[in-house]
């Protein structure tokens, strides 16, 4: 559940697997960790070698997938990070920087400055996720960190991700599918990819006229692009990354905590209608910041309700959250590039504090 590494997350959470390795290009380590109540880490791209790892879109470099560890505890993530030596990996992969991983125990949480946000300005997070992030902020404050409110720049950043990932017009997707039947979750994506440009433009305008601005823009950005437009997207990605750095520097931030997703785990078969709910996860793979997820709490029965709205995406999110009481809720911890040690140290501090809470989503088996 939650992404391409969802099977591994479910196996870890249920005690069938001690740990696992996932890949993340849009949240496929972090979202399954959040949905299943385990811990996961998406390192900086090429912190671990990606040589030998298959990618869904070979040659697409605007947004890159990265392998990373998944486990029941943050200590296990730290162990896995220690087990992979970049100074050896770089001998077989020139993309890997020879920077040693120092370990979370070398990081002093007290004195760190952490930004916090519960709404990315694109899609509001479920009340349970907002509560979890606030609780994580309290726990880090108790550990000696300074936690301040942070407003992330460019709330519609995910459209750049979608524009880049679809720049081949769906050719790679079509080739991969071959004659296979399309699963329900991919049907809308395939339908839009196959839609002629003029038809897509008309549909987008109609959606915009009905007030569905987010879906209208989705239709506008998806599809084949000439090289010059792809280069412009790549430059925009770089500028967005610099803006994020500047925003962190303005506040003197060492890290940020925020929701990993806009909602808890969704019912089977509904994810295809909720692609835009991934904005919190897309953000930090697009910007190439290391990011991890640590379990904090569970959904309360008064947190299944969103404010009433006419927006289609918000309505779909609200419908999928019905019956979510008791589901695990994680918090995303983001650090500066190559500071996986700092990310895990903050995750460990949150984990230590949250374990004493009544709603902590403990996995059914003890760590191995």
Specify the residue positions occupied by each region the protein language model found.
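Short pre-catalytic strand/loop immediately N-terminal to key active-site residues, enriched for Gly-Thr
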Residues: 1-3
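Structural helix-boundary/capping segments
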Residues: 14-123, 134-143, 220-224, 231, ...
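Glycine/Thr-rich phosphate-binding loops of Rossmann-like dinucleotide-binding domains
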Residues: 29-30, 124, 262-267
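Amphipathic alpha-helical segments in well-structured domains
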Residues: 38, 130-134, 166, 276-281, ...
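Serine-dependent amide/ester hydrolase catalytic core
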Residues: 108-109, 118, 155-157, 172-309, ...
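Soluble, non-transmembrane catalytic domains of enzymes that act on hydrophobic metabolites at membranes
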Residues: 125, 132, 153, 158-162, ...
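General small-molecule cofactor/ligand-binding pocket signal
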Residues: 146-151
């Amino acid at each position: 559940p939650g992404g391409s590494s969802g099977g591994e997350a479910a196996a870890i959470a249920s005690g069938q697997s001690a740990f696992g390795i996932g890949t993340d290009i849009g949240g496929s380590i972090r979202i399954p960790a959040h949905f299943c109540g385990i811990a996961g880490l998406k390192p900086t791209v090429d912190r671990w070698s990606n040589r030998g790892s298959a990618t869904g879109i070979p040659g697409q470099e605007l947004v890159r997938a990265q392998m990373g560890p998944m486990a029941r505890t943050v200590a296990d993530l730290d162990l896995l990070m220690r087990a992979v030596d970049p100074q050896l990996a770089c001998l077989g992969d020139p993309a890997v920087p020879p920077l040693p991983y120092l370990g979370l125990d070398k990081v002093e949480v007290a004195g760190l400055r952490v930004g916090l946000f519960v709404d990315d300005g694109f899609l509001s997070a479920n009340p349970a996720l907002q509560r979890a992030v606030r609780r994580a902020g309290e726990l880090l404050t108790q550990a000696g960190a300074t936690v301040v409110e942070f407003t992330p720049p460019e709330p519609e950043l995910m459209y750049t991700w979608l524009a880049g990932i679809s720049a081949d017009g769906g050719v790679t997707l079509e080739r991969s599918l071959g004659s296979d039947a399309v699963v329900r979750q991919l049907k809308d994506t395939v339908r839009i990819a196959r839609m002629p440009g003029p038809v897509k433009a008309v549909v987008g305008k109609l959606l915009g006229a009905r007030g569905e601005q987010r879906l209208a823009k989705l239709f506008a950005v998806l599809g084949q692009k000439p090289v010059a437009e792809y280069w412009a997207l790549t430059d925009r990605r770089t500028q967005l990354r610099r803006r994020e750095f500047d925003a962190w520097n303005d506040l003197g931030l060492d890290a940020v905590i925020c929701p990993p997703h806009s909602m808890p785990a969704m019912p089977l078969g509904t994810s295809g209608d909720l692609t835009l709910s991934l904005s919190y996860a897309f953000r930090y793979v697009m910007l190439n910041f290391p990011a991890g997820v640590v379990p904090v709490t569970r959904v309360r029965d008064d947190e299944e309700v969103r404010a009433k709205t006419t927006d289609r995406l918000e309505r779909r999110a609200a419908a999928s959250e019905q019956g979510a009481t008791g589901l695990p809720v994680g918090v995303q911890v983001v650090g500066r590039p190559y500071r996986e040690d700092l990310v895990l140290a903050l995750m460990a501090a949150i984990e230590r504090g949250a374990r004493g809470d009544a709603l902590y989503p403990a996995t059914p088996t003890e760590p191995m």
